Amino acid sequence: MNKIKVAIIFGGCSEEHDVSVKSAIEIAANINTEKFDPHYIGITKNGVWKLCKKPCTEWEADSLPAIFSPDRKTHGLLVMKEREYETRRIDVAFPVLHGKCGEDGAIQGLFELSGIPYVGCDIQSSAACMDKSLAYILTKNAGIAVPEFQMIEKGDKPEARTLTYPVFVKPARSGSSFGVTKVNSTEELNAAIEAAGQYDGKILIEQAISGCEVGCAVMGNEDDLIVGEVDQIRLSHGIFRIHQENEPEKGSENAMIIVPADIPVEERNRVQETAKKVYRVLGCRGLARVDLFLQEDGGIVLNEVNTLPGFTSYSRYPRMAAAAGITLPALIDSLITLAIER
């Protein structure tokens, strides 16, 4: 049987570049090479595409210039060797890219043009989930609770007196808590807006939600969905930003991730059902991690949806899947299969 040629794309221009490299390293270590023939394409922080042997911290050292061709006849890569391009057919693409140009529909559009099946959400659902304000509007219209929020553009000044503190100020289109600030008073607001504006021109100001933060890994296309165990983030202080820490592999500096979540089974079931509803409302396919707040009165409020969650050794999505009995090799296999079947 011929192996399935899988292009695993990692790195990228976003602030989450280093996380993406770590995710690709884990996937490379766990993909079934008896079934799949992986081709690793790294994107530098400056946006240069290169074919490399394997993802690692020094992946650029031994690499060749390569690009995905939008030509459907090529159906794959153009690789520069000895001043000439050679073509490499690809059966399916697995973008392991986080943040802008990875989770926002941009690279998904390239795969659509090229006619190559790809792991994860399509253009529309990727864009909707990446923009937190759009995700809130769509899910609220479907009857899902969301935080009170307002949007401003970079350089605008909100009417501070209309806000009930604390609030969170965050880039509307970013991830891993980059540019996110908890604001407790009017005096802190302008600095928080400036910090968020470094990552996006569209800024979200949302009401802080009391309760615990929980998450749910969802996998599948359309109605046939599989969920992982619910996890729970227990903070000692500050906000959850493990991907910005120096040594996250040794554990978070301010958070404990509990899998399964330390909540009653009935509440875990409700969180899973809410996560599946959010997934369907936003048109997700393949996979997504749905983050929610569980309030003391039992209310469940949407936080955000990550359409290409991390696959690092400390990432939440694979840990939730593992707690439900899905190993990382099996998870990778299932995600590639879902992409081909879609």
From Swiss-Prot:
Inducing stimuli: By vancomycin.
GO molecular function: ATP binding; D-alanine-(R)-lactate ligase activity; D-alanine-D-alanine ligase activity; metal ion binding
UniProt remark on cofactor binding: Binds 2 magnesium or manganese ions per subunit.
PANTHER family reported in the protein's UniProt record: D-ALANINE--D-ALANINE LIGASE, D-ALANINE--D-ALANINE LIGASE A
Main localization of the protein described in the UniProt heading: membrane
Its membrane topology: Peripheral membrane protein
GO cellular component, one term: plasma membrane
Primary role: Required for high-level resistance to glycopeptides antibiotics. D-Ala--D-Ala ligase of altered specificity which catalyzes ester bond formation between D-Ala and various D-hydroxy acids; producing a peptidoglycan which does not terminate in D-alanine but in D-lactate, thus preventing vancomycin binding.
TM regions (residue ranges): none
Family: Belongs to the D-alanine--D-alanine ligase family.
Positions bound to Mg(2+) 2: E304, N306
Residues binding Mg(2+) 1: E304
Protein name: Vancomycin B-type resistance protein VanB
Residue ranges annotated for the ATP-grasp domain, each copy included: 136-337
PROSITE patterns membership: ATP_GRASP (PS50975), DALA_DALA_LIGASE_1 (PS00843), DALA_DALA_LIGASE_2 (PS00844)
Cofactor(s) this protein cannot do without: Mg(2+); Mn(2+)
Keyword vocabulary terms for this entry: Antibiotic resistance, ATP-binding, Cell membrane, Cell shape, Cell wall biogenesis/degradation, Ligase, Magnesium, Manganese, Membrane, Metal-binding, Nucleotide-binding, Peptidoglycan synthesis
InterPro entries: ATP-grasp (IPR011761), ATP_grasp_subdomain_1 (IPR013815), D-Ala_lig_Van_CS (IPR000291), D_ala_D_ala (IPR005905), Dala_Dala_lig_C (IPR011095), Dala_Dala_lig_N (IPR011127), PreATP-grasp_dom_sf (IPR016185)
Chain positions recorded as substrate binding sites: H243
Recorded catalytic activity of this chain's protein: (R)-lactate + D-alanine + ATP = D-alanyl-(R)-lactate + ADP + phosphate
